[in-house]
Amino acid sequence: MFSNLSNSEILNNLLEGRDLDDLTSRSLMQRWLNDKVSDVETGAFLSALRAKGSTGVELSSMAEELLNVCDLPVARPNLYLVDTCGTGGDGANTFNISTAVAFVAASCGVKIAKHGNKSASGKVGSADVLLNLGLNLNCSLEKVINAVNEIGITFLFAPVWHKSLIKLAPLRKTLGIRTVFNQLGPLVNPLRPNAQVLGVASEDFLKPMGSALLKMGMNRAIVVHGSGGLDEASLQGENKLVFVENGELRFSEINISDFNHENIANEKLVVSDFQSNDEILKSVLNGSGQKSHIDVVALNAALVLWVAGIEDDLNEGFNKALISINQGDPWKKFLLLKNYLSEN
């Protein structure tokens, strides 16, 4: 079923700028999973893929192979699930916007299956902040899945579900560059969500990530690259979007000014340390946060409400998110999840 090309032949193709087809992409991932690629070869593959740029076929094929070895301990909930996991790696050191967005969207009725990890860069990862706020990430996998049914939101800690990739972590850290695995992370949620808002740190990722989501059968999705280089929709200016719907990609832009709100520089969203990040996240969720923090979360939550089919008008979604935040509903949702995952 898989490619007969040797590792060196695949590498030569990449170095010469040739895209990998479906079978070769799947074969390469299988070799990683089965320890058929040396550290030296892995470093070369990752560097060559980064230099060439990954395609939608390469990303979707590799992601499918990762998902094929990720077994669920219980049946997937029969729900329309949405994820807010992005690539990270924008280097902007903003507070963890996508995590706040997940709880805001859940408080508005979206069934959220949030996939995430600890930080692999200077930015605070979703798992870091949730651990600091007391969320139990060591409970049974059955409970993690059942939380979606019981609470309407759950968090899937990536290393627990993708143990086969742990061995690559030291090498990726040594390389110190964004690799194809940064792009694969948002594509390998074990619960295979029906819809997703996926932030990317590079404008070059918009089309391939959108194409990958399309090939993987996503019902609705938005891939977003924020003004100023954020991997979230930004308040600073024009944000570039790719809408995935009805088997097609549609390119668009949005600006916070479209929502009758003023533009605000990304620097207003920066945090200096873990404690600041935790405090900001809590203040946004309970409705006591700064206007810039609340607005950027509401803007991104509007995108989630669109992919979930709850609000087809982004302005309506933005206002719905603001109302929920001002009532403190997202923080109540967080506490429900925290208490549920802490129960024996």
From Swiss-Prot:
Bound cofactor: record note: Binds 2 magnesium ions per monomer.
PANTHER family according to UniProt: ANTHRANILATE PHOSPHORIBOSYLTRANSFERASE
Binding site for Mg(2+) 1: S98, E232
GO terms, biological process: L-tryptophan biosynthetic process
EC number: 2.4.2.18
Residues that bind anthranilate 1: G86, N117
Function: Catalyzes the transfer of the phosphoribosyl group of 5-phosphorylribose-1-pyrophosphate (PRPP) to anthranilate to yield N-(5'-phosphoribosyl)-anthranilate (PRA).
Stated name of the protein: Anthranilate phosphoribosyltransferase
Binding of 5-phospho-alpha-D-ribose 1-diphosphate, residues: 86, 89-90, 94, 96-99, 114-122, 126
Amino acids binding Mg(2+) 2: D231, E232
Binding, anthranilate 2: R172
Family of this protein: Belongs to the anthranilate phosphoribosyltransferase family.
Cofactor(s) annotated in UniProt: Mg(2+)
Enzyme class of the recorded protein, top EC level: transferase
GO CC term (a single one): cytosol
Functional pathway: Amino-acid biosynthesis; L-tryptophan biosynthesis; L-tryptophan from chorismate: step 2/5
GO molecular function: anthranilate phosphoribosyltransferase activity; magnesium ion binding
NCBIfam families: trpD (TIGR01245)
Subunit annotation: Homodimer.
Reactions performed catalytically: N-(5-phospho-beta-D-ribosyl)anthranilate + diphosphate = 5-phospho-alpha-D-ribose 1-diphosphate + anthranilate
